[in-house]
Amino acid sequence: MRVAVLGNSGSGKSTLAGWIAGYTCAPLLDLDTVVWEPGKIAVARSPEAARSDLHAFCSAKKHWVVEGCYASLIDTALEYSPVLIFLNPGEGQCISNCRARPWEAHKYASRAEQDQQLALLLSWVSEYYTRDGDMSLTGHQACFNAYTGRKVEVTVRPQLDPPSAEVLAWLN
């Protein structure tokens, strides 16, 4: 089982990908960990380095889950024919999820540091619907529409505990 999860910040990517990885015992790659310099906030690595790390992860494992908001990197993962899950729950749900987000220790040294970035994050989430590019609704829709493999667009929060029949069908 290979799964790629794509969506806006706050769409539920990390929650769903983490659940799938746990349920299937598959390794999980959060694309933020290959895009950004370790231990540095908003210091990007080269796109080539990120793609190289993603290829290394995908080619080394039979089963995996990757998640992120980077359409170009998801496109790279799609070369390995995963199920593509595009989370598109709408701006209100993404904002609500961001406000309720637990501390992301892999991104921030403290909860306080993360909270200092919340206003910027909420603005980023809202701009998703009007900007263009790799991390926009337009970019995500283009990635989703171009993929000819198994895929699903999810517009409501999936039921994970216990998993709904719909969620289990994505994994079969």
Language model feature labels by segment:
Residues R2:
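Walker A (P-loop) ATP-phosphate-binding motif of ABC ATPase nucleotide-binding domains
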Residues V5:
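Hydrophobic anchor at the beta1->P-loop junction of P-loop NTPases
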Residues S9:
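The conserved Walker
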Residues K13:
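Conserved lysine of the Walker
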Residues G18-K62:
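Conserved substrate/cofactor phosphate-moiety recognition/catalytic segment
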Residues Y23, E127-N172:
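NTP-dependent small-molecule kinase module
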Residues A50-I95:
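Glycine-rich phosphate-binding loop used to anchor ATP phosphates in small-molecule kinases
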Residues P89-S136:
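A glycine- and Lys/Arg-enriched "phosphate-lid" helix/loop adjacent to the NTP-binding pocket
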